[in-house]
Every structure is written in structure tokens, then in C-alpha cells.
């Protein structure tokens, strides 16, 4: 299968000619995913996820999350934190963890959930909005043209895209009165960053759990995952 059910047509036909039983999904993987998500009950999905964080994944996920928050002092009284959601599983999980933290924390802090649309297709945008609704996350979505800006950049487009995304998130969060942004990078991302720096750049680079912004005074980046 493929995303839209077009590229997989020829592959399925070729496999059938070779004697295999092969099919191409009508509308592709995205159409199947939208249909599957539509069958799910939003309230039941939210409750199931929240219960799993409190019980099944309490030690593995929740306790490690709160341990990082305490150890690195990532959340302080009266903080206003912009939890940045890309639409992937890591940032969605982080958003649910912050919801739980706000319920059980000893001191007050505010949380804003942000989704930056860098130029997603309508299908991807619809999936992200649907997942937010199912998980009970009220997020503010703002649009940018980052994908269009880096489309023709031949050298290090991913680096430029990441830098631009970070800048937009800082700027929008600051306008909302936030003093921190939270990103969903985790331990695997740290290892990948170190290895990529060593293999491609002959240097050791890593990700810090918290980082003060140089371009946005008073803003701080935190990585509680």
C-alpha cells in the first residue's frame, strides 16, 4: 500500500501477474486510517489512554517523566508552558503527560498546547485534528509556510526546517504569554543526535534537558521525555 493508493496499483498488479494474491487499498493508507479512526469512540479512547498511563505504563512512562521534571527542575511555580505538538506519537504522549502533571502537581502552572502546521496536506491535517479530539487535547493550531520555504533548498534542508520551526514556536508561544516551550525529544533522539554528530560532523553534540533561548529573551526550551 501507499499513502494515496496510486503508487501501489502497479506493484499490486505486478505481484498478481507473478501468482501472488495482492491488493491495493482504495484511497491508500491515509483513507484506511481515516476510516479506522472514525470507528473509534472518542471518549473511550481518551479514557483508555489516560488509564494506561496511570496503571500499565506508570513505571515505564509516567514515573520517568516526573523524575526528569524533578531532577532537572523543568517546571517551576507559575510557569506558562507551551507544549508543542507535531502530530506524532511522542509529542501527543507528552501532551497527555502534561495534562496528568497539571492534575497532580503540588504547585500551580499553566499549559498551552500548540500545533504548528508547516504546510501539511489536508489529509494529514485532518488526522492530527482527529487525534487531538480523541485524546481530549484542546490545542491551538497556527499555520506557517516552512515546507514551501525549504522545498528548493539543496543543502541541509532538514536543519533549516528544524531551525525555522523552533523560531516559529518560540515566537507564537511568547505571544501567548508563555515562558517555556516543551518538545517531545526523548532518549533515542539524544543517542541518534550524538551518533550523527560523530559520524557526519566529527564532533560530539547532544540535547540538553533545558536550554535558554538566545534569540527570545526570557524563553526556555525543556525536554521532559
Name every feature range the model reports, one short phrase each:
Residues 2-3, 86:
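The conserved beta1-alpha1 loop
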Residues 3-53:
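Rhodanese-like catalytic fold shared by cysteine-dependent sulfurtransferases
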Residues 18-20, 135-136, 217:
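Short, structured coil segments at secondary-structure junctions
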Residues 20, 179-180, 219-223:
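Short active-site oxyanion
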Residues 25, 142, 222-224:
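Hydrophobic residues at beta-strand termini and immediately following loops
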Residues 32-36, 150-151, 215-217:
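Short, charged, surface-exposed secondary-structure boundary motifs
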Residues 41-212:
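ATP-dependent adenylation/nucleotidyltransferase module used to activate substrates
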Residues 206-225:
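Short, flexible loop segments at boundaries between secondary-structure elements
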Amino acid at each position: 500500500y501507499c499513502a494515496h493508493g496510486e503508487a501501489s496499483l502497479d506493484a499490486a498488479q505486478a505481484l498478481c501477474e507473478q501468482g501472488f494474491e495482492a491488493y491495493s487499498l482504495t484511497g491508500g493508507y491515509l483513507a484506511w486510517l481515516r476510516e479506522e479512526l472514525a470507528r473509534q469512540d472518542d471518549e473511550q479512547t481518551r479514557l483508555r489512554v489516560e488509564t494506561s498511563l496511570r496503571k500499565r505504563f506508570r513505571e515505564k512512562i509516567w514515573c520517568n517523566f516526573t523524575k526528569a521534571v524533578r531532577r532537572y527542575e523543568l517546571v517551576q511555580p507559575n510557569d506558562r508552558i507551551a507544549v508543542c505538538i507535531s502530530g506524532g506519537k511522542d509529542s501527543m504522549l507528552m501532551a497527555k503527560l502534561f495534562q496528568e502533571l497539571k492534575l497532580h502537581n503540588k504547585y500551580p502552572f499553566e499549559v498551552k498546547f500548540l500545533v504548528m502546521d508547516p504546510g501539511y496536506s489536508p489529509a494529514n491535517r485532518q488526522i492530527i485534528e482527529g487525534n487531538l479530539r480523541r485524546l481530549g487535547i484542546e490545542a491551538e493550531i497556527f499555520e506557517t509556510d516552512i515546507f514551501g520555504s525549504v522545498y528548493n533548498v539543496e543543502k541541509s534542508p532538514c536543519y533549516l526546517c528544524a531551525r525555522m520551526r523552533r523560531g516559529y514556536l518560540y515566537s507564537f508561544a511568547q505571544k501567548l504569554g508563555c515562558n517555556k516551550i516543551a518538545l517531545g525529544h526523548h532518549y533515542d533522539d539524544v543517542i541518534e543526535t550524538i551518533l550523527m554528530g560523530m559520524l557526519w560532523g566529527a564532533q560530539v553534540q547532544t540535547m540538553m534537558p533545558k536550554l535558554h533561548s538566545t534569540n527570545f529573551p526570557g524563553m526556555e526550551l525543556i525536554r521532559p521525555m
